[in-house]
Amino acid sequence: MQDLPAGQAQQPFLTRSFFFFQYHFRESDDANASNRSPVSNPYEPDYDQLSPPPMLGAQRPVPEQNESSRDLLHSSYHGSIGQASYDQGSFNGHNSTYGVGGFGHYPPDLHGRLPGSPGYEYPEPEYDVEASRLAESRLSVMHRTPTMQEWSPNGETLSVSPDFAHGRPDSTYQEFDVDESWMMRQQQAQIGGGGLGRSKTRKVKLVQGSVLSIDYPVPSAVKNAIEPRYRNGPGSMEEEFTKMRYTAATCDPNDFTLRNGFNLRPRMYNRHTELLIAITYYNEDKVLLARTLHYTMKNIQDIVNLKRSKFWNKGGPAWQKIVVCLVFDGLDKVDKNVFDVLATVGVYQDGVLKKDVNGKETVAHIFEYTSQISVTPDQQLVRPDPDKPHRNLPPVQFIFCLKQKNSKKINSHRWLFNAFGRILNPEVAILIDAGTKPGPRALLSLWEGFYNDRDLGGACGEIHVMLGKGGKMLLNPLVAVQNFEYKISNVLDKPLESAFGYVSVLPGAFSAYRFRAIMGRPLEQYFHGDHTLSKTLGKKGIDGMNIFKKNMFLAEDRILCFELVAKASQKWHLSYIKASKGETDVPEGASEFIGQRRRWLNGSFAMSLYSLMHFGRMYGSGHNVVRLFFLHIQFVYNLLNVLFSWFSLAAFYLTTTIIMKLVGTPQVLSGYHGWPFGDMASPIVNVLIKYIYIAFLVLQFVLALGNRPKGAQYTYVLSFMVFGLIQLYLLVLTGYLVYRAFTGTPIEDQISFASGQAFFDSFFGGNTGVAGLIIIALITIYGLNYIASFLYLDPWHMFHSFPQYLVLMSTYINILMVYAFNNWHDVSWGTKGSDAAEALPSANIVKDEKGKEAVVEEIEQEQEDIDSKFEKVVWRALAPMSEMMEEKPEAKDVEDSYKSFRTGLVILWLLCNIVLITFVTTDDFSSLGVSKASDVRTPMYFRFLLYSTGVLSIVRFIGFLWFIGRTGIMCCIARR
């Protein structure tokens, strides 16, 4: 956030691959800098002894240089006293000068020009070029410089990065294994990280003789970034800005208590935590993590900068009431590059982790620090600018929980709620998945919902799809389809459920709960899905569950929502908050899309049945009569949706075949001809399309039973294309039917206004009720979506995403649901051991000098060594990210009973849909006393289908209108 001098901001940096930036912090004139020595490292090359990286080919282009840019190579960028500064330095930490050898060991060229000067011609290589490529890529970490930033007039960050004489390398770790490098760095402190023989040891007393909690000095860069107004402000503690606290938790989350010797800084400082923001992480890259982390800090800035708040401006600084907790699910799955981002922020350091304490395995590594530094998704460093304090990010209290083993998201939430939540006792806990980008004031809007409604137990904001610059992602039909799905859910589904008081799912990617509302039974039922509790819970745990309940925990968020609303003697309700917006990316490929929806569809279907079967628990809650009445309406609404979903496979097949028959083979008495290929060709084409439809539907069952989506991704792409083309053909035929219905017979002749009964019969029923049926279908299926989207003030998805959704609509059933139901048995649980943890050092307990108290000997590093290591951390953190390697699928070990249940479910599903198809399309059912004519049953079925869909759409629209009206009123009277 610090402005650069004019010349430095505009002129390019000239640098050679043998020169790199050093990150210096000058609290004095640095007069003793000449006495410094480089820090040796047994796992990294000695940069002083290395030859310059060879040139790859002919002469290198050198950026044009003038006196201004040359001066930058000899001078440091100085901030105010105590603030961070960037220097161009040589390997011993001092500014280098021009001359022979200034750029490696290159001599002046034939014209007497020095290396680095304009027009300098580098000599041709005299050694094997191919053999030198590896050396250059290994040294690419030296080519990187921290990307600095400055504020533009509108407050955005601008990249100010140097140019490279050798060209900008693709990645810091292009050929060097990131995981291996990270594991090596964990051992450095144990073998003398200083490398100068000057490292000291200190004895750290264990809390209650068993809890290892150590304070580590942070790099000067990090602690000097804290503004004096915060460092010396009310309620601030010096150690939270100068020391990072590390705790090795060797216990279960339920045992992380004050009684057992564990504590957290906010409580140690007697601070009230109003807002606990949890970011759950699995294996996302550093760009996704930086996106969530940076915009979370921007949201905290929105809260701190409030001027007229009746709450946040009382009882201490606002930033002291907010805690950000990052929970990482296991060491092995972590992209090790994210540790560099966290280390740059100050909440992590290499060489600190302990795999066990006196032989007792560490379950979670917990770091605590309060920082004012951030890294943007574009790898720009953001730090305070003393000249523009109103634009600076406020201090943020961080808790970083790194679980040693991968134990799933539910276990991460158990650390959040049962461990940290019980100590901090927050009023509201906000859950965000790594990769989700909170919009401006999104977290504030979520909190205001709880502040203004004392009975609000949970809430969620609007999640919309990242569309890229200029909406370029919409060119991918799968992204456009998901964008429409997200949007229409935000416009119609969530407002309706919010009106009833029970939102069926608060997405874990962006939701919030009142902490005291979910305490007790809601969390107890929710944590039954944590496999680390399976032995403790016995039959109630995940190992004792049948496959149906295990599938429920694929949609664990829905369990928490139902348990919260049905909580005994309580009247908590759930709500959707329109003003709170978050942005997330969605699967772009067919295989990823199918894999994601398998979990969603199976989990939501199982949980929908569970909520319907246990609806009676609502009578034991504290809801009033009015709320219970609307919950009953929602019960009927959800029941109809489940039934329609169950028979949707038959519904799509019947719709496709019958419309093709009506258009291609019209009745002779109607006077119409086969369309669009004539009386002879249209029936033949329609029969071929029907066979292709059936063949690809059967193919989906074969693929779902025997292949993973990644192993048959091209076949799935072809399936999406085929079903999409058939659906497009069907839409054309439907448009022709609508045109024929309104042009063949005038509308006034089809609808009678002679009397109310005549109007009702002609519009809704009888043989002449076609026009009314079509009008209802057009209004409810298309019209209400457009009207609601315009009233919502967000109609654009109806234009750029709705067409793709109409074309690919059938694939949601024919591909996604078929795959999901055929993989109902696919539920994998259990912990995965951590290979990365084996590289971590142990903490061995010894007695103190008096032979009484238990202590741990810890190497104490000099501040200069910490700062030197931090320079490399910043380079790695701000380096462009290389492409991630594809994850290897885990081996599955599924019981035969799960597959048997899956087989029975699929057979029952197919049987029900086949019976419906047969009943509608077969002529002779005389033995059952049913009319012989299928042409009588078919219109009846479609009338029922369209009228039912219309009623459900009208209910959604009424709920939407109520939500919009209530939201508008609440905006006028809400407290802030």
Swiss-Prot record:
Membrane spanning stretches = 639-659, 684-704, 717-737, 773-793, 801-821, 903-923, 944-964
Q: What upregulates it? A: Exhibits higher expression levels in hyphae than in germinating conidia. Expression is increased in the absence of chitin synthase CHS2.
Composition-biased stretches, type Polar residues, lie in 31-40
Q: Which residues are glycosylated?
A: 32, 66, 95, 602
Just give the chief location class.
membrane
Cite the EC number: 2.4.1.16
User: One GO molecular function term?
Assistant: chitin synthase activity
Protein location: Cell membrane
| Catalysed reactions listed for this entry | [(1->4)-N-acetyl-beta-D-glucosaminyl](n) + UDP-N-acetyl-alpha-D-glucosamine = [(1->4)-N-acetyl-beta-D-glucosaminyl](n+1) + UDP + H(+)
Location of region: Disordered: 29-72
Quote the InterPro entries the UniProt record gives: Chitin_synth, Chitin_synth_fun, Chitin_synth_N, Nucleotide-diphossugar_trans
Q: Which domain of life is it from?
A: Eukaryota
Membrane topology recorded in Swiss-Prot or TrEMBL = Multi-pass membrane protein
For this UniProt record, the keywords arranged alphabetically read as follows:
Cell membrane, Cell wall biogenesis/degradation, Glycoprotein, Glycosyltransferase, Membrane, Transferase, Transmembrane, Transmembrane helix, Virulence
Q: Does the keyword Hydrolase apply?
A: no
Q: Which GO terms describe its cellular component?
A: cell septum; plasma membrane
For biological process, the GO terms are: cell wall organization; chitin biosynthetic process
Q: What happens when the gene is disrupted?
A: Does not affect mycelial growth, virulence, nor sensitivity to various stresses.
PANTHER family attached to this UniProt entry = CHITIN SYNTHASE, CHITIN SYNTHASE B
- Family assignment from sequence similarity: Belongs to the chitin synthase family. Class III subfamily.
Q: What is the annotated role of this protein in its UniProt record?
A: Polymerizes chitin, a structural polymer of the cell wall and septum, by transferring the sugar moiety of UDP-GlcNAc to the non-reducing end of the growing chitin polymer. Shows additive effects in septum formation with CHS1, CHS2, CHS4, CHS5, CHS6 and CHS7. Involved in virulence and mediates mycotoxin deoxinivalenol (DON) biosynthesis via the regulation of the expression of TRI4, TRI5 and TRI6.
Please give the name of this protein. Answer: Chitin synthase 3A
